[in-house]
Regions:
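A structural "hinge/loop" feature
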Residues: 51-68, 91-93, 118, 171-180, ...
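Gly/Pro-rich hinge or "lid" segments in bacterial periplasmic/extracellular proteins
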Residues: 72, 82, 177-236, 240, ...
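Aromatic- and charge-enriched surface segment that lines or borders ligand/interaction sites
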Residues: 93-138, 161-163, 252-255, 305
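Surface-exposed binding/hinge segments that line
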Residues: 143-188
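Detector for C-terminal structural segments
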Residues: 15-22, 292, 318-352, 395-405, ...
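N-terminal lobe/hinge region of extracytoplasmic solute-binding protein
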Residues: 48-99, 130, 203-205
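Append "and occasionally in soluble cytosolic enzymes with long acidic Gly/Pro-rich linkers
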Residues: 214, 219-229, 284, 306-406, ...
């Protein structure tokens, strides 16, 4: 028994000694440091632009995309838009709206300065708005007429208010214009700005400042920008961004292969496969704000069958829209589910998708009283159903038209194609002198989803309700949606509108094309949402980086 107690004592002493040693070792151990790579400043990004240099001035870049791309980096707007099409502050720190929705009060960021160090003030906004309101034909007519209805009143150097004649919910979307420096240009009209030296060495308030022009044989071949250290959103990581001009997409791609550029601003469908097979080059695609649609004239005296919603739905079911995207557009489009773009905050994702199903189309037509004659032609009351499709006389639209013609022939409908110049196509829409028209609707004016101009009853006579769709309930929804400042109510109203559009199908939405561009994989943290303009690819350029370090 005594021997046993000694054994227990030895075990306890040994355990105590081991514990002391372990405690000592643990107290001497140093914590392991884990390095987390973080973006650091440095590097240069060079991008190929397709087109020519004209002038760097956001009031004059409406018709030249390369200028708009560069201006996006040089200048700032009052508001910009997130991936869902919602307005967020840019130069504007915040804003408020009056209870009746007619007065918008804005406060500018106190740390916003021009590239020459001068603070951005209310006077800069007032001057820029005055240019938009000017009688110059350099401002698009619809934009000029809109701004003539708006008054701007300074409150202080950093605050002001806009007054509208009536409540207009999409107003914020019209504030994406880029602001010009009044202290440098304030005594100049828009026409006087056209040939002003400012356009060759602009001063903006954006994340990058103008550095220099590249020239060759008297022609401008490139533009160099440098990160602006005092940008109100924080200095960008990439030190320099350079742009080089090329005549076409293929020449730009060859320049990438030769190491001249790091990015391609636009990819042609013909070059898509080469880009996909290029090691180290990342392809990015974003939906464009352009809807390819077949407008149906619901009041056409020569095509009364278009007045039947069931017939219109059969037309839609018979169209192989995915086939059009794959065969003609090389996959560079997404199916349209209605008049509001997918990804936008107002898009309702529970609409019918109208799958390609010729058998379903035939059955629907039979249920409506249509029948096929001995030659397989669709008839109603013994008369053949024959329609005419007007379309633009270019290879892409002609190829799409031929697929539509074949699809509808498969259900017995004879369709005659009428290719026309674009201007004539638009003129026929405006005069309602058509049966069916294939056209692309440009929805890029603002990211706001408001489809009022194309589908409201008030736009039937003299407006852009080309289909002449008469649905008083849908029109009421659209009227209310553009007047209320209640976001949740607007969303509900647009949902209700889309449900009615889906049920009645006054025209045939086909697809939204996508914009494709490519950037070398050494450029990191490129994040893209839907594009409302190709220049939107630079929305988060401040976060792009090339190098990392440890913190």
């Amino acid at each position: 028994m005594k021997k046993f107690r000694w054994q227990i004592l030895i075990v306890l002493i040994t355990a105590l000694i081991v514990g002391v040693i372990l405690f000592f070792l643990q107290s001497q151990a140093k914590p392991v440091s884990v390095s987390t790579p973080s973006p650091i400043s440095g590097g240069t990004y060079t991008e190929a632009l397709i087109g020519k240099f004209l002038r760097l001035n956001p009031m004059l870049d409406h018709f030249n995309q390369p200028d708009r791309d560069i201006d996006r980096l040089l200048f700032s707007s009052l508001v910009r838009f997130d991936a869902n099409g919602l307005p967020v502050g840019d130069l504007a720190e915040n804003w408020s709206v009056s209870t009746d929705g007619t007065v918008f009060t804005f406060n500018l960021r106190m740390n916003a300065v021009w590239h020459d160090g001068t603070p951005v003030t209310t006077q800069d906004v007032v001057y820029t708005v005055s240019l938009l309101q000017s009688e110059s034909n350099l401002v698009p007519e619809d934009l000029r007429e809109f701004w003539k209805q708006i008054s701007i009143s300074p409150i202080s150097d950093s605050s002001f208010e806009f007054s509208l004649p009536i409540a207009f919910s999409p107003f914020l979307d019209y504030l994406s214009f880029q602001v010009l420096p009044a202290h440098l240009l304030g005594n100049l009209t828009l026409n006087e700005l056209v040939d002003h030296p400012f356009n060759l060495a602009p001063v903006g308030s954006g994340p990058y400042r103008f550095d220099s022009l590249e020239t060759e044989n008297g022609l401008i071949t490139g533009v160099n920008l440098a990160a602006f250290d005092y940008y109100f959103g924080g200095r960008p990581f990439i030190d320099e961004i350079r742009f080089r001009y090329f005549s076409d997409e293929s020449s730009a791609f060859n320049a990438y292969q030769e190491g001249v550029v790091d990015g391609l601003s636009k990819i042609a469908p013909a070059d898509l496969e080469r880009v996909l097979n290029q090691t180290g080059l990342n392809l990015y695609s974003s939906r464009q704000p352009r809807l390819s649609i077949v407008f149906l004239n619901l009041r056409s005296a020569t095509a009364p069958v278009l007045q039947q919603a069931g017939f219109r739905k059969a037309l839609m079911s018979a169209v192989n829209r995915q086939g059009i995207i794959d065969e003609v557009l090389k996959g560079q489009a997404v199916l349209a589910q209605g008049p509001i773009m997918p990804g936008n905050w107002a898009f309702y994702d529970r609409q019918a998708s109208y799958k390609y199903d010729s058998d379903e189309a035939r059955q629907a037509l039979a249920a409506l009283g249509f029948s096929l004659d001995a030659g397989g032609n669709l008839t109603i009351d013994g008369a053949p159903v024959q329609l005419t499709l007007s379309l633009q006389d270019d290879p892409t639209h002609l190829a799409i038209g031929q697929i539509l013609q074949k699809n509808w022939q498969n259900i017995g409908i004879a369709v005659t194609l009428q290719p026309k110049p674009y201007d004539q196509l638009v003129a026929d829409l405006e005069s309602r002198a058509y049966e069916m028209t294939l056209i692309d609707l440009d929805l890029s004016q603002t990211p706001d989803p408001d489809p009022y101009q194309f589908w409201a009853e008030s736009q039937t006579e003299g407006g852009q309700n080309y289909s002449q769709w008469q649905n008083s309930t849908a029109s009421t929804y659209l009227e209310q949606a553009r007047q209320t400042s209640n976001f949740d109510l607007r969303k509900k109203l647009y949902r209700n509108f889309q449900v009615l559009f889906d049920e009645d199908l006054p025209s045939l939405p086909l697809y939204y094309p996508v914009y494709s561009y490519a950037v070398k994989d050494s450029i990191k943290d490129l994040k893209f949402g839907p594009l409302y303009n190709p220049a939107d690819r630079f929305n988060n350029v401040r976060s792009w980086y090339i190098f990392t370090g440890s913190e």
